[in-house]
Amino acid sequence: YTVAVSSIYALYESLRLLEEEGLENRWNRHKVNAEKLRKGLTEIELNLPISPNDRLDQLTVVTKPDHIDDVEFRNKLIYDYNIEIGRGLGDFAGKVFRIGLMGESCKSEYVDQILEVFQKEI
């Protein structure tokens, strides 16, 4: 089999960016932006069903309000705002949204945009 060379280049570039930023700085950036996102979501009265001790800084789970259609809402975000969020999986399908803040997408301005759109559309 042939190795996917583009994957090797992507790994190299990802590791280069991580080295440039520093591991501790990257962890801190994820922590700060996750806290900002969670605070903003609770301020617009959305429920975060995962207990604080079990939360990940890279993924925030939000209970979907009953009046929101899951597919319609996620489609609106992606087509109107270029924001993609995940749906619930398994028993949580149609009940929660999953918002990822990982790597280069974990930026304060992205958190601001997500919160602004959620405030407007929910």
What label would you give each PLM region?
Residues 1-4, 63, 104:
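Hydrophobic alpha-helical scaffolding
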Residues 1-35:
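Structural signature of PLP-dependent enzymes
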Residues 22-29, 45-52, 88-89:
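Flexible, glycine/charged-enriched surface loops at secondary-structure junctions
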Residues 47-80:
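Conserved PLP-binding catalytic core of the aspartate aminotransferase-like
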Residues 77-85, 119-122:
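A common structural junction motif
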